[in-house]
């Protein structure tokens, strides 16, 4: 995957527009989770160190396009950046017709979704973005699967279009895990439904050696193998699909599970052998023997891709399976990559973020890359690099 990289460019005195993913949760006018801002900071600092006049843009939330809304304003992000960088970071609302920024200065543009034509990727808007800068830097992997004005359109028209360090690192890590993985490779794919992860499961079945499934997805595979799943969440109409996937790749199934009679924080957890699951049982986690078996598989893997907790880890009594696998990945010498919202929450809960080789910041984009889909914002950078 050949793209121009910001790190290779001379930015001295250049006007640089950086598209970041600063779509963070905001509560009472204050940033509630700063993970995405922290991920973007090194890119912003590097552009400033290289002597650029730096303009940063992002979306936040889902405002009605073309209309300002205070709740979707990036003001809390500008305030956060000012504190984090120890300098004033002005929030600029009217920037489409030009903005004065000097070398070494930094401004944050107001929410790009307040601009008409952003989501439709209108050429007229994209050309206005492009006219603001000498160099456009796409650094928002989390929105790379969307062809929008500030992610794709601007890269068509900017004098120079490059990948930022964060985007480049994502592409390198995903390429390492999927294009030429060190073998054996294990993938953990968990979630409530096979239907939502079908493309991911199919794509990984042709590249990995062990496909570990969890959550409602595992229940469908268990049912496909003729095991009882009680009143657990599963998809009867996808049993044949599960069988077809299991015929292509090794899908180790749980030998024991943690069940309850209800889905609740106060539900009583009981460990049962898979054959003993009763008609009124709900499977809410893998059992301790299964967790140990899966951890052993991970120990011998050279590449591990993790997407989704294997149980209802938000309730502690159903969190052991995810905890054991998280620790196994952390202790492994394998190249490990993890992504997807719930996966990140599990990584935080069990404190293993420093031991995982790469944690992807993109939820939907991560999944689409794993599915083998083309990410429009990356494809345009590749096109521009060829030209």
Curated annotation (Swiss-Prot):
Would the keyword Iron turn up in this protein's UniProt record? no
Name under which the protein is recorded: Phosphoglycerate kinase
Which positions are annotated as binding ATP? 197, 314, 340-343
Q: Where does substrate bind?
A: 21-23, 36, 59-62, 113, 146
Q: Per its UniProt entry, what is the enzyme's top EC class, as one word?
A: transferase
Protein family per UniProt = Belongs to the phosphoglycerate kinase family.
Which sequence ranges are marked TM in the entry?
Answer: none
Task: Describe, as the record does, how this protein assembles with itself and its partners.
Answer: Monomer.
Known EC number(s)? Answer: 2.7.2.3
A molecular function GO annotation: phosphoglycerate kinase activity
Q: Which organism is it from?
A: Pseudomonas putida (strain ATCC 700007 / DSM 6899 / JCM 31910 / BCRC 17059 / LMG 24140 / F1)
GO CC terms for this protein? cytosol
Q: Indicate the principal place this protein occupies in or around the cell.
A: cytoplasm
Signal peptide boundaries: none
């Amino acid at each position: 995957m050949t793209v121009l990289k910001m790190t290779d460019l001379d930015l001295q005195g250049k006007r640089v527009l950086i598209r970041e993913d600063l779509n963070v949760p905001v509560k009472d006018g204050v940033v509630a989770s700063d993970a995405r801002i922290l991920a973007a900071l090194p890119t912003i600092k590097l552009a400033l160190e290289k002597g650029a006049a730096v303009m940063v843009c992002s979306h936040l939330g889902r405002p009605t396009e073309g209309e300002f809304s205070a709740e979707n304003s990036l003001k809390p992000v500008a305030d956060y950046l000012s504190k984090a960088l120890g300098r004033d970071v002005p929030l600029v609302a009217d920037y489409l017709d030009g903005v004065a920024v000097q070398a070494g200065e930094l401004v944050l543009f107001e929410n790009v979704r307040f601009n008409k034509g952003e989501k439709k990727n209108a050429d007229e808007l994209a050309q206005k973005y492009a006219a603001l800068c000498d160099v456009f830097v796409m650094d928002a992997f989390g929105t790379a699967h969307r062809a929008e004005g500030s992610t794709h359109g601007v890269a068509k028209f900017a004098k120079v279009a490059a990948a930022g360090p964060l985007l480049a690192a994502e592409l390198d890590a995903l390429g390492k895990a999927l294009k030429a993985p060190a073998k054996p490779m294990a993938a953990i794919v968990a979630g409530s439904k096979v239907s939502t992860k079908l493309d991911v499961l199919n794509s990984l079945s042709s590249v990995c050696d062990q496909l570990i499934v969890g959550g409602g997805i595992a229940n469908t595979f268990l049912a496909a193998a003729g095991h009882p799943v009680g009143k657990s969440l599963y998809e009867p109409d996808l049993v044949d699909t599960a069988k077809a996937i299991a015929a292509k790749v090794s899908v180790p199934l749980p030998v024991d599970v943690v069940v309850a009679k209800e889905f609740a924080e106060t539900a009583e957890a009981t460990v049962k052998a898979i054959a003993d699951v009763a008609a009124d049982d709900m499977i809410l986690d893998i059992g301790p023997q299964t967790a140990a078996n899966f951890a052993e598989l991970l120990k011998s893997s050279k590449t591990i891709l993790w997407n989704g907790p294997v149980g209802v880890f938000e309730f502690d009594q159903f969190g052991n399976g995810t905890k054991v696998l998280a620790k196994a990945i952390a202790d492994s010498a394998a190249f490990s990559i993890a992504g997807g919202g719930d996966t990140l929450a599990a990584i935080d809960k069990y404190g293993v973020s420093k031991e995982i080789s790469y944690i992807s910041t993109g939820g939907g984009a991560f999944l689409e890359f794993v599915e083998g889909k083309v990410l429009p914002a990356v494809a345009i950078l590749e096109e521009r690099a060829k030209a």
